[in-house]
Curated annotation (Swiss-Prot):
A motif (QXD) lies at residues 45-47. Its EC number is 3.2.2.-. It comes from Escherichia coli (strain K12). This is Interstrand DNA cross-link repair glycosylase. GO terms for biological process: interstrand cross-link repair.
Length: 410
């Protein structure tokens, strides 16, 4: 039996459909959409850079449109979500606690995220900290005074911050909420009172099978080699997983133009029929975060979208090719470009410092309309009243070369 043959555009559209980025939202977002959208992606990576809206809020905005950013914080505080190390530090459904509990119980395998020597050296102080949380309730690292005021850099964290990070990685405490994006910790047994390790623990092998299932569903269409990166799995049993899921017809083989044979998750079978009939169309234009699942695996983004991306915020300014915090631009199924932007919150201006189009992308009327609306929506969501434009490709935004005002109801 011959494999279904898909164009590269169809493969991209199927992936974007799995990620919730194929079409513009048809309705106003609701509070319930926050955990639902994170479940769809499986993971929502956390990053603290706030040159524009912080990444987790932006990833949700790209899919949901205009929504109150505090909804993510509320979803965490209500216990619908949890934080832990997955792809990197991530929000995930709290029901997935079982998938990462084995990591908590072996923190010494977590590399730089857990320093056993530090935890042993400060054992008595850490025991006092645990007792303090037990007696006084949840804490932030900011609740404790730094003994070396003026120190800076992650390697000079105040001791209680390092203690809490270690306890977090070891699963002794969990994040129950964020206040001004600062973590608030409580003891794990109070956050998960019904959990019992002896009764409920899932083995690493079993957990990784479910992680591979989640990765396949969230990617929608994939090469086998793309799966492990989603949860940062080191040596998953990929061959056995693939054979089992193919036999169960939970994944099916397809042939994709330029990419060869890929796998398709069975959740996308209805869309596969539309793609084969030439009826699967991408209509969404959006500003993406550098930590969006669509681009967080740089090799996958290059293979699937022909989009080479590198985060340059840690690169010295003179050596940057594009800018400090460059945002990929999605338009109708393609990653058509990127922009270096900064939100000036005091003046209400979204500054587009520079914008670049991918090689071969023409500044058509449709492209200009889509990108202008995407940038306008992005600015409006951040309460901007104006967009200013710096360097742009020739022929793009010729009728508003220096920028435009924001209509609050746009």
């Amino acid at each position: 039996m011959s494999l279904p043959h898909l164009s590269l555009a169809d493969a991209r559209n199927l992936h974007l459909a799995a990620q919730g980025l194929l079409n513009k939202p048809r309705r106003r977002a609701s509070l319930e959409d926050i955990p639902a959208t994170i479940s769809r992606m499986s993971l929502l990576q956390i990053d603290t850079i706030n040159i524009v809206a912080r990444s987790p809020y932006l990833v949700l905005f790209s899919r949901l449109g205009n929504y109150p950013a505090q909804w993510l914080d509320e979803s965490l505080a209500r216990g619908e979500l949890m934080e832990y190390w997955a792809h990197e530090a991530c929000f995930m459904p709290r029901s997935d606690f079982r998938l990462i509990r084995h990591r908590m119980l072996a923190p010494e395998k977590m590399g730089w995220k857990y320093k056993d020597a530090w935890m042993q050296e400060h054992e008595a102080e850490i025991a006092q900290l645990i007792q303090h949380i037990h007696d006084k309730g949840p804490v932030r690292s900011a609740d404790f005074e730094h003994p070396r005021k003026g120190a800076s850099g992650w390697w000079e964290w105040k001791p209680h911050k390092r203690h809490l990070e270690g306890l977090f990685t070891a699963g002794k405490v969990m994040v129950i909420e964020r206040r001004n994006f600062q973590r608030v910790y409580d003891l794990t047994h109070r956050v998960m009172p019904d959990w019992d390790d002896e009764r409920d623990l899932v083995s690493q092998t079993e957990a990784e099978i479910i992680m591979l299932d989640n990765s396949a569903r969230s990617l929608g269409i994939f090469r086998e080699q793309w799966l492990a990166d989603y949860y940062r799995l080191k040596r998953p049993a990929l061959a056995a997983w693939r054979e089992a899921r193919a036999e169960q017809q939970q994944i099916i083989a397809v042939h994709v133009e330029k990419l060869g044979n890929l796998w398709l998750h069975d959740d996308l079978l209805p869309l596969l029929e539309r793609a084969l009939a030439g009826k699967l169309t991408a209509t969404h234009s959006a500003v993406l975060s550098p930590f969006d699942p669509v681009v967080w695996d740089r090799k996958r983004a290059e293979q699937l979208f022909d989009f080479s991306y590198r985060l340059e915020c840690y690169t010295p300014a003179p050596k940057r090719q594009y800018g400090y915090f460059v945002l990929p631009l999605l338009h109708r199924g393609q990653l058509v470009g990127r922009m270096d932007a900064k939100m000036h919150r005091q003046t209400g201006i979204l500054e587009v410092i520079s914008l670049w189009l991918q090689e071969g992308i023409k500044p058509t009327t449709t492209l200009q309309k889509g990108l202008r609306q995407a940038i306008t929506d992005f600015a409006n969501w951040q309460q901007a009243t104006r967009v200013t434009l710096g360097c742009c490709p020739q022929g793009l935004f010729t009728d508003c070369r220096t920028g435009w005002e924001i209509d609050p109801v746009a």
